[in-house]
């Protein structure tokens, strides 16, 4: 059986989740249908969002129309926290990957709640982990080839959104090859080639419900072998 001890970031996320559930218990949830936007780049940003159920992807689009997927967030996550920066409008577009239920919290109220529950210091540390993750993604774009970036991306998604099975991690959210290409920084055809290679090497598979199964130890060992 694969076991994993909760990290400080995981523990803080649980504390923040409880705090925000208390803060929003009397407010109605916002229902966002699959493929619909929560907000788009350029919108005013005065609120943070807390995900009750579902998945949200954050995407930035270049002037040439090329998409870069920044992150995928699931139940218990917050997003839209750049409203705390005092910058102009939203820099990214937030889109539901499946039917999603959200709670909306004004930025000032969000900070007040964290302060009330003595979670501000933890929130700063939580954000630094996100920054470190993004720095690693940027470094990988320069130092790691596309196949390795895909493997690392699959492992990151599995860690964040997957469900543990005895010898693998199951990803139930549907992520298209086009979306993976936007995360990895390559083309959809190349993603298809690499995914087929991973399947042939028994590093990943799809179950009868079409969920992606990541064989964590095998994939990690393979990535180490091709450095």
Where are these regions (language model features)?
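Cytochrome P450 core scaffold surrounding the K-helix E-X-X-R motif
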Residues: 59-65
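Short phosphate-coordinating micro-motif centered on Lys-Gly-acidic
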Residues: 38-43
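Structural motif
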Residues: 55, 99-101, 210-211
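Polybasic "coupling" helices that flank or enter modular domains
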Residues: 118-185
